[in-house]
């Protein structure tokens, strides 16, 4: 299945139906009063976040979306039926952005969130509404109002507890494949991963969602190598797991390349908690590994972990789980657009 994380949509809510001007017509009733019904309301366009979706692929050939218009009113005080709402399901983590102003309309970052993006037009009034003591037979009615039309950009930012970052071929995909049920493609060449992958990892009594972010390269913050499409997914991660290929000639340079790109893209990303791991340690002698580990640890002034290609992942997974529990226990003030 393909992965689409951005799509432009043209939304048109339904127009309101027109009101009706009609009069009561019955045998032996010469001057029947007005009985024109109101027009029906136009359908709305509503977005709902669905935890069962993980891509915007279903919008690929559906860029113009229109809700039904309300029906016109009729005689005998019959109101037109309302237009049916259009319900659009999107993955959790989808943002709906106004294409013209570039402002975020809503951020659907929790399952089951519902938000009306385009409102249907009001139905027109039938002539019954204009009857008065001075106007017993009004012929006046109103037309329905047009529904809202909006051009929006849907952006999907993958939601995960942990984001695996690193240069291409650092072993991110294999790590995720080994510790989860993800079917990530693995190969011994750069850019095996061309889209984010999510995996669910069971750690003791906890579940951890881990995202394999495609390899980041120099100038990714400028969009090189689809950098913007990859970097935005890191914004949603609570913890970063930074994998570095221990066989790299300069592990400090390999670390700095990724760190700098994150900072240039969004300085908040480098404030996230980060666990640094030298990967593929079974490919070098112990003395070489220790030298590189100490060199990187001294540069970062923090602990650096080591991992073999087929080594035990449980210590790292338990560390991630513990840090997530601490992070989740902290009280965080989150802006909720659904609260007044």
Curated annotation (Swiss-Prot):
Belongs to the TRAFAC class OBG-HflX-like GTPase superfamily. OBG GTPase family. Its cofactor is Mg(2+). Its EC number is 3.6.5.-. This is GTPase Obg. It comes from Wolbachia sp. subsp. Drosophila simulans (strain wRi). GO terms for cellular component: cytoplasm. GTP binds at residues 166-173, 191-195, 212-215, 279-282, 310-312. Signal peptide: none annotated. It is found in: Cytoplasm. Residues 1-159 form the Obg domain. GO terms for biological process: ribosome biogenesis. An essential GTPase which binds GTP, GDP and possibly (p)ppGpp with moderate affinity, with high nucleotide exchange rates and a fairly low GTP hydrolysis rate. Plays a role in control of the cell cycle, stress response, ribosome biogenesis and in those bacteria that undergo differentiation, in morphogenesis control. InterPro entries: G_OBG (IPR031167), GTP-bd (IPR006073), GTP-bd_Obg/CgtA (IPR014100), GTP1_OBG_dom (IPR006169), GTP1_OBG_dom_sf (IPR036726), OBG_GTPase (IPR045086), P-loop_NTPase (IPR027417). Mg(2+) binds at residues 173, 193. It comes from the Bacteria. It holds the Pfam family GTP1_OBG. Monomer. CDD domains: Obg. One of its GO terms (molecular function) is GTPase activity. Keywords: Cytoplasm, GTP-binding, Hydrolase, Magnesium, Metal-binding, Nucleotide-binding. Residues 160-329 form the OBG-type G domain.
């Amino acid at each position: 299945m393909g992965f689409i994380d951005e799509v432009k949509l043209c939304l048109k809510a339904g127009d309101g139906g027109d009101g009706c001007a009609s009069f009561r017509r019955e045998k032996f009733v010469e001057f029947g009063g007005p009985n024109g019904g109101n027009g029906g309301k136009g359908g709305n366009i509503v977005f709902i976040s669905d935890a069962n979706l993980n891509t915007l692929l279903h919008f690929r050939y559906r860029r113009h979306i229109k809700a039904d218009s309300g029906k016109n009113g009729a005689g005998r005080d019959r109101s037109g039926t309302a237009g049916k709402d259009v319900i659009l399901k999107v993955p959790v983590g989808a943002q709906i952005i106004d294409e013209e102003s570039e402002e975020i309309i809503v951020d659907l970052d929790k399952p089951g969130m519902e938000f009306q993006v385009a409102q249907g037009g009001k139905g027109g009034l039938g002539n019954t509404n204009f009857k008065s003591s001075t106007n017993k037979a009004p012929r006046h009615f109103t037309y329905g109002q047009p529904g809202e039309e909006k051009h929006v950009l849907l952006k999907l930012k993958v939601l995960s507890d942990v984001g695996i970052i690193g240069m291409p071929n650092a072993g991110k995909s294999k790590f995720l494949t080994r510790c989860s049920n993800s079917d990530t493609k693995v190969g011994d060449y750069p850019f095996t991963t061309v889209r984010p992958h999510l995996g669910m990892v069971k750690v003791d009594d906890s579940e951890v969602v881990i995202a394999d972010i495609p390899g980041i390269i120099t100038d990714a913050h400028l969009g090189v190598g689809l950098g913007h499409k990859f970097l935005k997914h890191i914004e949603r991660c609570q913890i970063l797991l930074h994998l570095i290929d221990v066989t790299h000639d300069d592990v400090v340079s390999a670390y700095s390349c990724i760190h700098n790109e994150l900072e240039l893209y969004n300085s908040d990303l480098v404030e996230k908690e980060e666990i640094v791991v030298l990967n593929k340690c079974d490919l070098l002698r112990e003395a070489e590994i220790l030298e590189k580990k100490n060199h990187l640890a001294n540069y970062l002034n923090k602990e650096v972990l080591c991992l073999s290609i087929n080594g035990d992942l449980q210590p790292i997974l338990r560390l991630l789980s513990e840090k997530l529990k601490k992070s989740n226990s902290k009280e965080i003030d989150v802006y909720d657009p659904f609260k007044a």
